[in-house]
């Protein structure tokens, strides 16, 4: 879990344009501790520290433990797309499937 945790922390921090120092300061942690979380496998942060980081980074604490490594906004966009897809008429769904097949062949 920690390797994924470190990756998620680093990715979110960079997406938010935060340095290690700035995020650590905002979450009430030391810069070195945050570096350890991002880079070492053996770290086991407390629930309080994870909650502080989640609050600063704008995600729910369980995000750090989810297997889906996509950023929250990417997941939100995917979810919105599929909700919209479900409401389409059958002909429109078929057109989208054909477009998708065209993209698959091109890659």
Where are these regions (language model features)?
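A short, Lys/Arg-rich alpha-helix, primarily the initiator
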Residues: 1-15
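Residues that mark the N-terminal boundary/hinge immediately upstream of a DNA-recognition element
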Residues: 8, 19, 46-49, 60
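Short alpha-helical DNA-recognition segment
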Residues: 17-37, 52
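DNA major-groove recognition helix of helix-turn-helix/homeodomain DNA-binding modules
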Residues: 28, 48-63
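Recognition helix of helix-turn-helix/homeodomain-like DNA-binding domains
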Residues: 28-45, 66-69
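Interfacial/linker helices and their anchor residues that mediate assembly or domain coupling
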Residues: 68-107
């Amino acid at each position: 879990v920690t390797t994924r945790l470190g990756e998620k922390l680093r990715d979110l921090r960079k997406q938010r344009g935060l340095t290690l120092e700035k995020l650590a300061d905002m979450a009430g942690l030391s810069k070195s501790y945050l570096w350890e979380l991002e880079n070492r496998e053996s770290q086991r942060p407390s629930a309080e520290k994870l909650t502080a980081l989640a609050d600063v980074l704008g995600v729910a604490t369980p995000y750090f433990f989810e297997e889906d490594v996509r950023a929250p906004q990417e997941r939100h966009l995917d979810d919105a797309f599929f909700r919209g897809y479900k409401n389409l008429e059958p002909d429109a769904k078929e057109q989208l499937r054909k477009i998708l097949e065209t993209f698959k062949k091109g890659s």
